[in-house]
């Protein structure tokens, strides 16, 4: 597939490979939170195409879900949405996926900052962000400024439109 005269497939395949390895590590328990406990809950924080596509896919494939993992979705800027999701979460075993093309979407970033504060408050260290947050974004630098390790950022191209983002790292 060519875009702007460049073959984009090598980059897409590299990201898909990294996503597979990360997913397998979470599912197997090899990826752990700050305290060394395996992840049990994954919370997707996004809005629009960064929420609807993943939510649809999770629902459609729910019969094939990993039995040790729960998935929650937070998209409403009303704090009650995040609060409701966090009631079922243990900070030591929760992984947040911040899904934002630009990593500046107001609603998504408000929820991400609140989730980050909840996590850091509970675990007592900013270092926990690197083990409990991943980003799906075109803006690797902003995700890094948020505290997300570069290896935990799964990029996609800025030409991917929101309604089509389900076919990307989102």
Label each PLM-derived region with a short phrase.
Residues 24-29, 36-170:
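Glycine-rich phosphate-binding loops that contact phosphosugars or nucleotide phosphates
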Residues 1-34:
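Extended, charge-enriched "interface" segments that sit outside catalytic cores
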């Amino acid at each position: 597939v060519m875009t702007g005269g460049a073959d984009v497939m090598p980059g897409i395949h590299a990201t898909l490979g990294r996503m597979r390895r990360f997913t397998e590590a979470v599912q197997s328990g090899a990826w752990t939170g700050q305290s060394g406990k395996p992840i049990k809950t994954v919370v997707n924080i996004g809005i629009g195409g960064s929420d609807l596509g993943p939510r649809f896919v999770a629902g459609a494939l729910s019969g094939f879900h990993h039995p040790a993992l729960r998935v929650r979705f937070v998209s409403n800027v009303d704090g009650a949405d995040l609060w409701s999701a966090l009631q079922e979460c243990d900070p030591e075993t929760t992984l947040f996926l911040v899904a934002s093309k630009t990593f500046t979407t107001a609603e998504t970033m408000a929820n991400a900052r609140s989730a980050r504060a909840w996590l850091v408050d509970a675990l007592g260290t900013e270092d926990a962000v690197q083990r409990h947050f991943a980003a799906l974004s075109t803006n690797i630098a902003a995700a890094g400024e948020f505290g997300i390790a570069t290896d935990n950022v799964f990029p996609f191209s800025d030409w991917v439109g929101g309604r089509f983002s389900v076919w990307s790292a989102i």
